[in-house]
Curated annotation (Swiss-Prot):
GO terms for biological process: negative regulation of DNA-templated transcription. Residues 1-159 are annotated as: GAF domain. Residues 207-226 bind DNA. GO terms for molecular function: DNA binding; DNA-binding transcription factor activity; GTP binding. Belongs to the CodY family. It is found in: Cytoplasm. It comes from Streptococcus gordonii (strain Challis / ATCC 35105 / BCRC 15272 / CH1 / DL1 / V288). InterPro entries: ArsR-like_HTH, CodY, GAF-like_dom_sf, GTP_trans_reg_CodY_C, Transc_reg_CodY_N, WH-like_DNA-bd_sf, WH_DNA-bd_sf. GO terms for cellular component: cytoplasm. This is Global transcriptional regulator CodY.
Length: 262
């Protein structure tokens, strides 16, 4: 009991960590590392859309195909759809189970591998799943108590993360709207033409060519780009005779310009 209490305190202490420790790309790597070390297993956290938020591997279990999921930071759609249907913790799933984290081609290497999946709910909202697994040791009752506590702790952190993401999105959209509102009619036409030249969110363009094509002066394009760049919506770099390299930092600008019908 004392050992369980000590582990419980370690898990709940995760809530006291500073938000500055979150990494942008995999914001919960540190949390999964702590959980994996406390429970002596591998662990990962995925949201309800399959995005990998963090993982930590204490033991090698994967092959190149599965490692690719960690590189792309997305889990297969079929797996996530099935995982999202779980409303209570599913413990010690064998390698043959559809929700086993062990890939089919490695089942013979880890015949005793066991997967436990705990849904992450906060205020009735499904935010994702906490997945832990071991090569050959069963998760006992103490482990499952820790899993339930862990999923609650992670849920609180995910809710905070989601709230911060929502606030960031609102700030980004507001910045785009305010910047676009400062553009003149000609500058709006210029921005629309410029965005149409890009290959996705970045590309090379020649201001004089665009200016001639839509019947405006080059200075209009320069002014429009300067306004967007000062608002943090784009970044640009002169390529000399080759034109200008442009990268869109806030993609919401595409939709905002489209709404203006330019």
């Amino acid at each position: 009991m004392a050992h369980l209490l000590e582990k419980t305190r370690k898990i709940t202490s995760i809530l006291k960590r500073s938000e500055e420790q979150l990494q942008e790309e995999l914001p919960y790597n540190d949390i999964t590392r702590q959980l994996a070390e406390i429970m002596d297993c591998n662990a990962c956290i995925v949201n309800s859309k399959g995005r990998l938020l963090g993982y930590f591997m204490r033991y090698k279990t994967n092959n190149d195909r599965v490692e690719a999921f960690y590189q792309t930071k997305m889990f297969p759609d079929d797996y996530i759809r099935s995982a999202n249907l779980i409303y209570d913790t599913e413990a010690n799933l064998p390698v043959e189970h559809e929700l086993s984290i062990f890939p089919v081609e490695t089942q013979s290497d880890f015949p005793d591998g066991l997967t436990t999946i705990a849904p992450i709910h906060v205020s009735g909202i499904r935010l994702g799943s906490l997945i832990i697994w071991r090569n050959d040791e069963k998760f006992d009752n103490d482990d499952l108590v820790l899993v339930e506590i862990s999923s609650t702790v992670v849920g609180i952190q995910l809710l905070n993360f989601q709230r911060e993401e929502d606030e960031k999105n609102i700030r980004r959209r507001t910045a785009v709207t305010m910047a676009v509102n400062t553009l003149s009619y000609s500058e709006l036409r210029a921005v629309s033409a410029i965005l149409g030249e890009l290959n996705g969110n970045e590309g090379h363009l020649t201001a004089s060519v665009i200016a001639d094509r839509i019947g405006i002066t080059r200075s209009v394009i320069v002014n429009a780009l300067r306004k967007l760049e000062s608002a943090g919506i784009i970044e640009s770099r002169s390529l000399g005779m080759k034109g200008t390299y442009l990268k869109v930092l806030i993609p919401d600008v595409f939709e905002e310009i489209k709404k203006r019908d330019y």
